[in-house]
Regions:
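Active-site clefts of carbohydrate-active enzymes
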Residues: 72, 80-81, 85
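Histidine/acidic residue-rich metal-binding segments in metalloenzymes
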Residues: 1-44, 50-72, 89-111, 167
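Short Asp/Glu-rich motifs
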Residues: 23-25, 85-86, 121-122
């Protein structure tokens, strides 16, 4: 799929590693394919929840690989916290990828919501402020600067991920 996207000048969004399995390595493969085909920011990995279960050493190698590829990330906090960790007793995983760590590596991250009133998540409203609100809680991004970043994630970052130019208001 990455090759086809590159050949046709298309964007490539993969719902990738949406699992609790710490051994899932699809995002690593995706990052390598993004680099191989030169897709960069035209490629987005959605969910990436396996990273919440991966050991820190592996993630310390994975995040630079993702950053070098130029691909972006789209965690979906509402559905991810509902589906992931569902079979855990306690401690229970939050079901969200490593948002702050990705940002620290310069990876563009935009909050998403891919389930709106469907069998997986019947509570979706398609309101990105709801998504940002939940995301900042689950990712523990409650410092004022982090909260501001959460709202940038549903506006400017998502526009960048979608390839929209001239988005936003400037004074």
């Amino acid at each position: 799929l990455g090759r086809i996207a590159a050949e046709r000048g298309l964007m490539w969004d993969v719902h990738c590693d949406e699992t609790d399995d710490p051994m899932s390595r699809h995002v690593e493969t995706m990052a390598r394919e993004v680099t191989r085909y030169g897709l960069g920011v035209r490629a987005a990995g959605s969910h990436l929840t396996s990273m919440h279960s991966m050991d820190n050493y592996y993630v310390s190698k994975l995040l630079p690989l993702i950053a070098e590829s130029g691909m972006t990330a789209i965690p979906n906090p509402l559905i991810n916290i509902t589906l992931q960790g569902r079979h855990d007793t306690y401690p229970k995983r939050r079901g969200l990828t490593r948002v702050k760590e990705m940002q620290a590596h310069g990876i563009t991250v935009g909050w998403g919501q891919d389930c709106v009133m469907d069998p997986w998540y019947s509570l979706g409203t398609a309101d990105m402020l709801d998504v940002a609100f939940m995301g900042l809680h689950v990712a523990q991004m409650t410092h004022p600067a982090e909260m501001a970043r959460c709202f940038t994630m549903v506006t400017e970052n998502n526009a960048r991920i979608m390839g929209l130019e001239g988005y936003g208001l400037k004074v």
